[in-house]
């Protein structure tokens, strides 16, 4: 069920691209837009928040919906504030919630998730989301990818554009992360490349030029190491990982610890059955460097099979977690899992595109007693939830982490158990 399905009248035909209309935004939509109505159409309003009365320039017109962006705020939503991000104020697409009150942000994100679970996930009975704010709300990003223009200047991409904002910084970023990389007097780079910069838990900055990763992949190809040795060190609990700066790691400095703590609390309460003398088996899918392996092992005493497409990430995890009962497998989840022992518990953290029907069906076919599913896109997460339901699983708990403050993005963790026969 889409947002346009709620219309009961035929849209008027006179709306065209470039028109300016006045609308009231009534609720949030997935993707950071607000929803309004005009002439029988749903209007998706970029830059609009619930309660806004705004003038909108139309950029796209379809039969039952249109899209546009705010050109003037006539009556401001009570949730609207002055922009919290200089780069976003200059047109960058980094912080699309920069003008949304921090106090309203997580509640609006929760509303969007619930809506997606109803419309796409087909759920009528949704657990009340457990909401987690991650602090700080500014200066939280310790790794960033920058575009580079034809003259070699690095900056933040404008919304749905290859153009860059090169003169001011984004408020997400730890200030010292981009000192000398963005803004007046910054160094230049290879034109039309991309730059990854990261500050790790040692306080060491690494800067590399990369070739952009293919869609759906987490790792870039490093072309030049410009600062540091091309690797980063990250520590959670008693374990330290060393891996290439282009490898995947959570963006918010507090996210790894927060997710690990929640997963640990879930698994601590698990009552597993049919466990033989060798102990339980757990799958850690899309596991990266094995961030969640220690907490899985600590909570369950399980042997963990961690599956990750990137061979470099799997090797980094193997090095960091030597001595723990874990086996790393480099390969595609859908290929490797058929060779693994049946799991009692599965933790999976798929990319933004989601796990997909085939992977969910494969996992469900292995009949784990408990599944912890991490999602960073509410629409694909909701689609996966529908597949879990079809595979015989019930969504018992739902957590929302505001891990990307001032943006429409957030992290969701769903806890699933097998339905009773």
From Swiss-Prot:
PROSITE patterns: SAM_MT_RNA_M5U, TRAM, TRMA_1. It is an enzyme of class 2 (transferase). One of its GO terms (molecular function) is rRNA (uridine-C5-)-methyltransferase activity. Keywords: Methyltransferase, S-adenosyl-L-methionine, Transferase. The keyword DNA repair does not apply. GO terms for biological process: rRNA base methylation. S-adenosyl-L-methionine binds at residues 250, 286, 308, 349. It holds the Pfam family tRNA_U5-meth_tr. Its EC number is 2.1.1.-. The active site is at residue 376. PANTHER family: RNA M5U METHYLTRANSFERASE, TRNA (URACIL(54)-C(5))-METHYLTRANSFERASE. This is Uncharacterized RNA methyltransferase CE1797. It comes from Corynebacterium efficiens (strain DSM 44549 / YS-314 / AJ 12310 / JCM 11189 / NBRC 100395).
């Amino acid at each position: 069920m889409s947002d346009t399905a709620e219309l009961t009248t035929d849209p008027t035909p006179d709306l065209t691209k470039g028109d300016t209309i006045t609308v009231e935004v009534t609720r949030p939509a997935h993707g950071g837009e607000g929803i309004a109505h005009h002439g029988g159409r749903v209007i998706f309003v970029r830059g609009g928040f619930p309660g806004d009365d705004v003038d909108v320039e139309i950029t796209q017109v379809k039969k039952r919906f249109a899209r546009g962006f705010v050109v003037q705020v006539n009556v401001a939503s009570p949730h609207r504030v002055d922009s919290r991000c200089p780069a976003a104020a200059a047109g960058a697409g980094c912080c699309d919630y920069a003008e949304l009150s921090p106090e309203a942000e997580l509640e609006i994100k929760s509303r969007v998730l619930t809506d997606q679970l109803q419309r796409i996930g087909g759920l009528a009975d949704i657990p009340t989301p457990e909401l987690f704010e991650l602090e700080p709300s500014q200066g939280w990003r310790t790794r960033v990818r920058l575009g580079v223009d034809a003259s070699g200047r690095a900056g933040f991409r404008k919304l749905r554009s290859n153009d860059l904002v090169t003169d001011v910084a984004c408020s997400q970023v730890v200030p010292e992360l981009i000192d000398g990389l963005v803004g007046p007097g910054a160094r230049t780079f290879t034109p039309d490349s991309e730059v990854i910069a990261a500050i790790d838990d040692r306080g060491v900055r690494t800067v590399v030029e990369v070739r952009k990763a293919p869609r759906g992949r987490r790792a870039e190809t490093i072309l030049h190491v410009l600062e540091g040795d091309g690797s980063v060190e990250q520590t959670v609990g008693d374990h330290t990982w060393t891996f290439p700066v282009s490898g995947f790691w959570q963006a918010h400095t507090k996210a790894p610890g927060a997710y690990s703590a929640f997963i640990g609390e879930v698994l601590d309460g698990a009552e597993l059955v049919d466990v033989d003398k060798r102990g339980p088996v757990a799958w850690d899918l899309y596991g990266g460097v094995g961030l969640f392996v220690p907490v899985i092992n600590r909570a369950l005493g399980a042997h963990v099979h961690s599956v990750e497409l990137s061979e470099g990430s799997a090797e980094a995890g193997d090095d960091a977690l030597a001595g723990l009962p874990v086996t790393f497998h480099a390969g595609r989840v859908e290929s490797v899992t058929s060779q693994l022992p049946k799991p009692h518990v599965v933790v999976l953290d798929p990319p933004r595109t989601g796990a997909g029907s085939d992977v969910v069906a494969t996992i469900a076919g292995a009949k784990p007693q408990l599944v912890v599913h991490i999602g960073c896109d509410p629409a694909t997460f909701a689609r996966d939830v529908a597949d879990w339901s079809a595979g015989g699983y019930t969504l018992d708990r739902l957590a929302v982490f505001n891990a990307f403050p001032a943006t429409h993005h957030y992290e969701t963790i769903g806890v699933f158990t097998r339905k009773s026969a």
